[in-house]
Amino acid sequence: VVVITGASSGLGLAAAKALAETGKWHVVMACRDFLKASKAAKAAGMADGSYTVMHLDLASLDSVRQFVDAFRRAEMPLDVLVCNAAIYRPTARKPTFTAEGVEMSVGVNHLGHFLLARLLLEDLQKSDYPSRRLVIVGSITGNDNTLAGNVPPKANLGDLRGLAGGLTGASGSAMIDGDESFDGAKAYKDSKVCNMLTMQEFHRRYHEDTGITFSSLYPGCIATTGLFREHIPLFRTLFPPFQKFVTKGFVSEAESGKRLAQVVGEPSLTKSGVYWSWNKDSASFENQLSQEASDPEKARKVWELSEKLVGLA
């Protein structure tokens, strides 16, 4: 059994379909919009019985806890958890907030997943599947040792003062580095750096004792995905051909879904603490993370601040 957050569209749906089609995986589609996810699974041709749709709104920590309770009541084993759902609001100049009053990009992409993964770690440990995994979807945009990661505004967590202040925007900053002005594109990139730091911190704290594989991946640029739905129309028109012909980083949703499915089930990809990428021939390789995204001291601080913000400390 694999749980995939944000499986109602894009990469999450493509991976859910790829895994369900193997006949070996039952996919739990953990989605904010139950109806949309059910329709999407049917439209994708996923066979009845190969998936279960469950409600999860990562913008509410109560909803995360309710999902975990509901999943346990369903008495399914948990063999792999995929943290995939993401909010990207690149043109936003004002923050929006989660139910707890935390800036939305970091609240959903990082903190909601952080709580979910911490709670479900117990379930992963109970599974007798020999290759249990926790997979966090990263992004090249948060990795400043790549071309795409150097497109401004660059990810930068600074000294984490905004995160320490709870990212409320009211009493302090809604940006992790404490910047007074809000930038939606940077908030997304910062949240993905938090994802990558979290994966490594999970690896350091739990891999040796549990044998669980903790990994992250960048499945390639899915230029046609709905993740870009808030971008300016000109960008949406120009970006796919630019990716396809200029940077050659373009992959279809189906191909990216297969890549995520590989990281979920492929026996050769069991190494823990790794950030997987794919080359032009679609061969997987271990990618280097930027200095900030692989800073163990920063990872520890993000972990400890996140524990407080989700009520685990």
From Swiss-Prot:
Q: What is its EC number?
A: 1.3.1.33
MF annotations from Gene Ontology? protochlorophyllide reductase activity
- Cross-referenced SUPFAM superfamilies, in alphabetical order? NAD(P)-binding Rossmann-fold domains
- UniProt-listed Gene3D superfamilies: NAD(P)-binding Rossmann-like Domain
Pathway participation? Porphyrin-containing compound metabolism; chlorophyll biosynthesis
- Which InterPro entries does the record associate with it? NAD(P)-bd_dom_sf (IPR036291), Prochl_reduct (IPR005979), SDR_fam (IPR002347)
**Could you give a single Gene Ontology term from the biological process aspect?**
photosynthesis
Return the CDD domains for the record.
LPOR_like_SDR_c_like
- According to its record, what are the GO cellular component terms? chloroplast
| Coiled-coil annotated spans | none
Keyword set, alphabetical order = Chlorophyll biosynthesis, Chloroplast, NADP, Oxidoreductase, Photosynthesis, Plastid
Which compartments does it reside in?
Plastid, Chloroplast
One Pfam family, short name: adh_short
> Which reactions fall under this protein's catalytic activity?
chlorophyllide a + NADP(+) = protochlorophyllide a + NADPH + H(+)
Known function: Phototransformation of protochlorophyllide (Pchlide) to chlorophyllide (Chlide).
Record-linked NCBIfam families: LPOR
Q: Indicate the family of this protein.
A: Belongs to the short-chain dehydrogenases/reductases (SDR) family. POR subfamily.
Q: What is this protein called?
A: Protochlorophyllide reductase
Q: Which organism is it from?
A: Avena sativa (Oat)
